[in-house]
């Protein structure tokens, strides 16, 4: 799984520096962290569902997840401030590269009817968000042992200044973006 990080430093780094005419190596965009988030959905009041979410996140990422809580109360969703909602994991350094390699080489190919990642999922600052509707695309989650199929969000935070730099970085790393029609 170290190959992705090696690929970045040996090939992608130089290509990005040449493509954008960066003067300093510190200007070249890099991935700084990956945030993986999963919610219990309408079962957020169920303590077992929250524990299952935290367990699934720990299995997928290899790092302990922590609970996320509601910031505001929303009566329509029967939600109170401070109520547990799901879990979140922030990955950096080697665990980040290992997880990204797993997403690229294992999870994305297992997605049904995959037509490419949307280039519109950038936030304007070079960060990319991608969602999986089913967590069973990861090999650590077995269909037999889960109570409910849940989705998860993966946010890739980069040091890019804009979406073009972030897009080029992820494209050169091998992320399969959908072609513009």
UniProtKB/Swiss-Prot annotation:
Keywords: Ribonucleoprotein, Ribosomal protein, RNA-binding, rRNA-binding, tRNA-binding. GO terms for biological process: translation. The keyword tRNA-binding applies. The keyword Phosphoprotein does not apply. InterPro entries: Ribosomal_uL5, Ribosomal_uL5_bac-type, Ribosomal_uL5_C, Ribosomal_uL5_dom_sf, Ribosomal_uL5_N. Part of the 50S ribosomal subunit; part of the 5S rRNA/L5/L18/L25 subcomplex. Contacts the 5S rRNA and the P site tRNA. Forms a bridge to the 30S subunit in the 70S ribosome. This is one of the proteins that bind and probably mediate the attachment of the 5S RNA into the large ribosomal subunit, where it forms part of the central protuberance. In the 70S ribosome it contacts protein S13 of the 30S subunit (bridge B1b), connecting the 2 subunits; this bridge is implicated in subunit movement. Contacts the P site tRNA; the 5S rRNA and some of its associated proteins might help stabilize positioning of ribosome-bound tRNAs. Belongs to the universal ribosomal protein uL5 family. This is Large ribosomal subunit protein uL5. It comes from Mesomycoplasma hyopneumoniae (strain J / ATCC 25934 / NCTC 10110). The gene is rplE.
